[in-house]
């Protein structure tokens, strides 16, 4: 399980030196006063149940039918690899700071043509994120090369500033939701 201190740095709330005083990155949208309650949600990482989880996602997609999928972080890795196994069941994908990417050749289906990857702010604060945004762009480019409508939306380039890895918990999450809804509405 992650500690609050580890999450502070990894999720881009602030620097390690700023953790004990609660000093976030300037302009951070994360409600630092909620960190304790947020940390209560942390659970051990289950590394041996991935296949069972993928089977569950596929079963849900089969029951729902072709749909749009939104995923985040480690759930992005799980979901995107699952989509590559059953691209016929997904029409649109919105991946919020995913930790892994599908093989574009397996993920692109004539019916799954719309992909949006969203990345927040303060990426340069951690080499992990610098590498991840580069890999995200490579995934979008690979999907585009195969005929998909795939793009990376780096929020600061859209003047949406201060977002941590926990985009849906940040104070401006409604703004990100609106961007996502607009993107989906243009493609449905």
Where are the regions a protein language model picked out?
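Catalytic active-site module of serine/aspartate enzymes centered on a nucleophile-bearing elbow/loop
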Residues: 158-162, 166-188
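Active-site machinery of serine-nucleophile hydrolases
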Residues: 1-42
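Conserved acidic catalytic loop of the alpha/beta-hydrolase fold
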Residues: 47-68
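Conserved alpha/beta-hydrolase fold motif
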Residues: 69-70, 93
């Amino acid at each position: 399980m992650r500690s609050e201190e580890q999450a502070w740095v990894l999720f881009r709330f602030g620097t390690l030196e700023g953790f004990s005083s609660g000093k976030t990155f300037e302009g951070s949208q994360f409600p630092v006063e909620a960190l304790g309650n947020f940390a209560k949600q942390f659970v051990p990482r289950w590394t041996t149940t991935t296949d069972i989880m993928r089977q569950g996602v596929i079963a849900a997609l089969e029951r729902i039918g072709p749909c749009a999928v939104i995923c985040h972080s480690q759930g992005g890795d799980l979901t995107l690899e699952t989509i590559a196994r059953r691209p016929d069941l997904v029409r649109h994908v919105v991946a919020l700071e995913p930790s892994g990417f599908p093989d574009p050749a397996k993920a692109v289906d004539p019916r799954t043509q719309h992909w949006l990857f969203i990345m927040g702010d303060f990426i340069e604060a951690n080499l992990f994120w610098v590498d991840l945004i580069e890999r995200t762009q490579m995934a979008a480019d690979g999907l585009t090369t195969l005929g998909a409508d795939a793009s990376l939306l780096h929020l600061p380039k859209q003047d949406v500033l201060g977002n941590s890895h926990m985009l849906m918990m940040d104070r401006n999450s409604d703004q990100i939701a609106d961007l996502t809804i607009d993107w989906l509405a243009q493609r449905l």
